[in-house]
Amino acid sequence: MFNLDFDFSLIILILDLFGTVVFAVTGALRAIEHKYDIVGIIILATVTGILGGVMRDTILGVFPPNNFSDTIHIVFTTITAVVIFFLYHKTKKYENLFNIFDAVGLGVFTLTGVSIAHSLYSTNYVLIVISGLLTAFGGGILRDVFVREPPMVFTKEVYAVASFIGVIVFLILINLRVPFEYTAIMVIFVTTGIRLISIKLHWNLPRVKM
């Protein structure tokens, strides 16, 4: 993986796998809504779950990307897709399931993106911000493109802004030497919270009215 100490690596791996599963759920749900077969569901779940991390590793110069060199992420997305395939009719009554999973995934992947970038390039704030944002919604953009929908990050409520605020929270707390575990909780809580509140209250960024 990355050249990090054991505890940090383990925490990031656990969070990364959790975020991968959460985003894989959103990919599987989108695929089912668009009447994909089981193979299509697995592919879209995998695209959504891992390609944000692949983009992150690419700009950080990590080759091959961790999600390809360690197949555990693909195993997790495949299992997740199959589970959703069989349980979909039991879960579809929960109307907000997609939004909840997407918001949690946004928070977790914002954290893992900035954490890994900071561990490698602690003084390159531009790279840290880009890494956090790409990890957070890179897979989601490709998910929406695959099903021919406008990417949520560009159209739905407050999305990219929530991730960006999470990145800023991370940088502030890390520079204040707040312990990583507390920083992690705050980043996930703030990013996910802003996203869910924006959905609930229908917050949107300004756009041109046609």
Identify the residue ranges that each predicted region occupies.
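Short, structured motif recognition centered on aromatic/hydrophobic residues
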Residues: 43-47, 54-60, 130, 134, ...
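N-terminal topogenic module of multi-pass integral membrane proteins
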Residues: 1-50, 54-63
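Small-residue-rich segments of transmembrane alpha-helices in multi-pass membrane proteins
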Residues: 44-53, 102-115, 136, 158-171
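Cytoplasmic-side transmembrane-helix entry/capping segments in multi-pass membrane proteins
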Residues: 39-47, 70-74, 95-106, 131, ...
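C-terminal ends of transmembrane helices
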Residues: 24-34, 57, 82-95, 141-151, ...
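Helix-coil boundary and interhelical linker segments in multi-pass alpha-helical membrane proteins
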Residues: 1-9, 58-68, 114-127, 172-183
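Ordered, amphipathic secondary-structure segments that act as subunit-interaction surfaces
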Residues: 78-117
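Structural signature of hydrophobic alpha-helical transmembrane segments
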Residues: 8-20, 65-79, 124-136
